[in-house]
Amino acid sequence: MEGQNKSITFDGREIRLTTGLYAPQANGSVMIECGDTSLLVTATKTTKKEVSDFLPLICDYEEKLYAAGRIPGGFMRREGRPPERATLISRLIDRPMRPLFPSWMRDEIQIVASCLSLDERVPADILAVTGASIATLLGEIPFYGPMAAVRVGLIGDDFILNPSYREIEKGDLDIVVAGSKEGIVMIEAGANQLSEQDTIEAIDFGYEAVSELIKSQEDLLKDLGIKQVKPSEPEEDKTLPSFLEKNCTKPIELVLKKFDLSKEERDLELEKIKVETQGKIESLKDDNQLKVLLSENDKLLSSDFKKLTKKLMRSQIINDGKRVDGRDLDEVRKISASAGILPKRVHGSALFQRGLTQVLSTTTLGTPSDAQEMDDLNPSTEKTYLHHYNFPPYSVGETRPMRTPGRREIGHGALAERAIIPVLPGKETFPYVLRVVSEVLSSNGSTSMGSVCGSTLSLLDAGVPLKAPVSGTAMGLIKEGKEVRILTDIQGIEDFLGDMDFKVAGTDKGITALQMDMKITGLPVSIISDAIKKARPARLHILEKMQEAIEKPQETLSPHAPRLLSFRIDPELIGTVIGPGGRTIKGITERTNTKIDIEDGGIVTIASHDGAAAEEAQKIIEGLTRKVHEGEIFPGVVTRIIPIGAFVEILPGKEGMVHISQLSEARVERVEDVVRQGDEVTVRVREIDSRGRINLTLRGVGQNGGMSYPEPTPTPVAPLS
């Protein structure tokens, strides 16, 4: 077997491509490599037997732990359900690819990106997106490509192209920009309250790099002698569109101009027009061309009716500057917000509503042991902030089986999670693991941004000291030729019939998350810049409404939330606290009924529903780790007697021994003649031997229990900051 090897020099790195060797039965395949990261990306097209009204595109990213030299956990020692990370990368591939396939295409297309080797310096997701474009082009599948993606980071004042995992964690920006020759088709970003201008500059910087990769793909096709298959739309039968335009245009326009209609009322009136039109067609003679056409494809009427509705709604926005609910283009829907709506068994709760979109968010405070362990290829081993998004069928007035979360729910939850992370407090000041759940109770557009707003309110109600509140809004776009209209706070019908869904979240200081999806083949940076700038006043307006519900974190936590104490010990003394086989720390937890977590850096977190118990555990640990010095005097309790002396606990968990010769100035025959177990005595540290054992004495020390002794000298450690 022989393949063809090509390479692309990009940003000082070599991207290696191998074609014609792997997966020979796929329409197109490429092994794309950079550093030690290797992915096999395939594109396969099959003819769909059933007629549908959408493009059946499937994009899958799969990762196997052998790519990082690891064996899966669990009894089976085999990968199971795709982890959340794989689902998010699958969406990252799908979102820029989907708008670049022709809208009329109905063949099944599946793109599979398999991570075969992972280098922590080269994240696999960006290679997977670019590889999807290359595989599709090589497979000669109709496609408005090439398309490519890059990641942009920001460290200090410098943008970094395709940063490593460590650089991503270190920087203030993580943005993925995907584009075609026509412009940008997808953006996904998380940022540390970055200004709008800096964000726009990062997008521009990224698209310049995307253009280089697009040119490289065109050169690759020339080198391989492959001619790109440009989509050629089949000739459409105009019979039905002409009939609908003649019979339905005015009735639809009247409905779209009834600004006082609710979503349900508008949908019912449009459905009524469609049903009446269907009745007219059914009354035609059996040999009528239109009736024959619909008998062959019963979905055609709904499809073409939607197209006409879309055309008329867009025309109304372009020409009249009015939306279907009567709002101006930059107007936000009515907002209501409230916090603390559930009993305090739920640690924090809030209800956020914008128009007909309504989200209930709850916050649960957990202990460090509640952190989610990550069993995937991400270098991060655990998550301490979780956001779960649920979209039940009743939220859109439908009935269907309720399953496990799908890709959409996982993606929306991840976006809301990313928007909040930059404002969370450090674990040194607030060591709780946080889980927020957003339940979409009613949906009419922008539920993910409603979840961001609800999350903020819920976290504040739970007493989480956020650095700043976060709000979000979804921006839309109508583009007809050179005419462009940007819409603020889009609702469901505008999302469905528009060209862009651009979600922007942030604080009053700057942006924390972006997500842009297109339905056209690309937008210039200038239009995207305009949308970002117009989102800011909308976000600030929403923030004002949110702060009317709750302005700052609750001063006290729910009485049902665990109490945590966090402090630092010398990392070298961690073993002392844990003890042989974990006996010491187990004894402390059993004695105080607490949960104790110790990190490698020496941060100790104690969890308990009883604050006094947590403080007792802290005293024991501090006693174990406190250094004792010769000459110090302590009150203590005799814990046990042996023939040659007595053991005395001088600090919680720390004992020393008084040799029989040190019990008294006079000769002592039996230890029990002087002290017994449980006696309270005052002792002085005589010496600390080479093995760290503490030797004590009662000689020369008064036993009145009221004498003074030196204040404990704490072990010098770094402060918790």
Swiss-Prot record:
Main function? Involved in mRNA degradation. Catalyzes the phosphorolysis of single-stranded polyribonucleotides processively in the 3'- to 5'-direction.
Q: What catalytic activity does the UniProt entry give for this protein?
A: RNA(n+1) + phosphate = RNA(n) + a ribonucleoside 5'-diphosphate
Q: What is this protein called?
A: Polyribonucleotide nucleotidyltransferase
Report the residue ranges that make up the KH domain in this protein.
562-621
Q: What is its main location?
A: cytoplasm
Gene Ontology terms, cellular component aspect? cytosol
Q: Name one GO molecular function term.
A: polyribonucleotide nucleotidyltransferase activity
Family assignment?
Answer: Belongs to the polyribonucleotide nucleotidyltransferase family.
What EC number(s) does the entry state?
2.7.7.8
Where do Pro residues bias regions lie?
Answer: 711-721
Q: Where in the cell is it found?
A: Cytoplasm
Q: Does the keyword Metal-binding apply?
A: yes
**An individual GO BP term:** mRNA catabolic process
Q: Which UniProt keywords apply?
A: Cytoplasm, Magnesium, Metal-binding, Nucleotidyltransferase, RNA-binding, Transferase
Q: Which cofactor does it need?
A: Mg(2+)
Please indicate which superkingdom the organism of origin belongs to.
Answer: Bacteria
